[in-house]
Amino acid sequence: MNVAIIGAGINGLMSALELSEQGIQVHIYDQQQAGLEASWAGGGILSPMYPWRYPQAVNTLAKHAKYLYHQWNEKLFPITGIDFQIQQTGMLIFDHNDFAQGLAYAEKYNEPMQRCEKISQSKIKNINPRVSKNLQEAIFFPELSNIRNPRVLQSVIRYLQKQPNVQFHENIKISNLIPNKDEVHAIQDHNQNIYFHDHIVIATGAWSAEWSKQLNIQLPVYPIQGQMALFKTPPHWLPTMCMNKVMYLIPRQDGHIVCGSSMKDIGFNKDTCNDTQKNILAACFEMIPELQKFPLIKAWTGLRPSSPHGIPYIGQLPHLKNVWLNTGHFRNGLCMGAASAQLLRQHMLSQPLIEDPTPYSPNQLYI
């Protein structure tokens, strides 16, 4: 089997990893270098933010993915020398309006990753002494982890580059799908070069709607811009992740702290905005006032692939027997990525599935 994967973000790369490990010949195409865009830009929380606000289909993939990332890191790190830097820092959430829902969710699903308790200021101080004294209560999720997105991407790319059955085609924009009855028998790039493959996987994230006309479906995936900021503190200065009013702080092992994130529906605009950055910083300083003492290293944006309810499309297109989707992960592309790729691989190779595929089925695009 020879598979073309269009898109080299986390979902395209993890799909390539899953398929290539089964001995399949994989070709990865991207309009720029592999591992950029939203996959690189995200914060790397290994759980949906406020999981009770999401459909359970999203949380299910996130649950599987957390364990898969640990397994992949154990396999790839000795070969690539790049550690994913998975940290179980836990998270403090300060949104009072979410306390009851969060506690009820944890009790209902009884997942270790989502175990939580409501705590008062004295315990908050013991867990994270950097938190503002104005925040009197929180719910604490001790099992929540984060992962360093760029390092995951670098490790996976380096590993795949070493595999004889994987080939990267970077800076090549695939612009056309060439149909033949009930399948796509070739793809064409912007320079009119044609490539023949047995199967096609579309993993183009925020750009996925561009395929709607050629696929004769309406693929409702479009970009939502998110802005981030990065501070540098001493290592281990901030002991936990923190979140309030959809803004978060994520500590890295080396003392960098990722702050985010905004949501703007402004197309493919990737410019940062001073007002948005001010809002992000104000929200983060409200949680951790001492952060203001440290240097702001940089700010950036990413384009999330928004989809209805944030549930990705994973599976085969019914009217094109060799075209598959793995896209539309919205804010949880990396969070769900490892499990999404595993589910896709199981689909493509007719293997037992980790979960009921119905919520992710492209069949719903035809209703």
Predicted features by range, described:
Residues N2-H27:
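N-terminal Rossmann-like FAD-binding beta1-loop-alpha1 element of flavoenzymes
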Residues A4-I6, Y195-W207, A341:
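Short hydrophobic core segments
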Residues I5, G9-I10, Q33, A206, ...:
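Residue-level detector of alpha-helix initiation sites
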Residues M14-Q22, Q31, G44-L46, I82-Q87, ...:
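Active-site substrate-recognition segment that forms the wall
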Residues I45-I127, A283-F285:
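Dinucleotide-binding Rossmann-like beta1-alpha1 core, especially the glycine-rich loop
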Residues G81-I93, Y105-K108, R115-Q163, S262-I266, ...:
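Helix-loop-beta segment of a Rossmann-like dinucleotide-binding subdomain
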Residues I139-N191, Y195, H199:
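Helical element adjacent to the flavin cofactor pocket in flavoenzyme catalytic cores
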Residues I288-E290, F294-I367:
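C-terminal catalytic lobe of FAD-dependent flavoproteins
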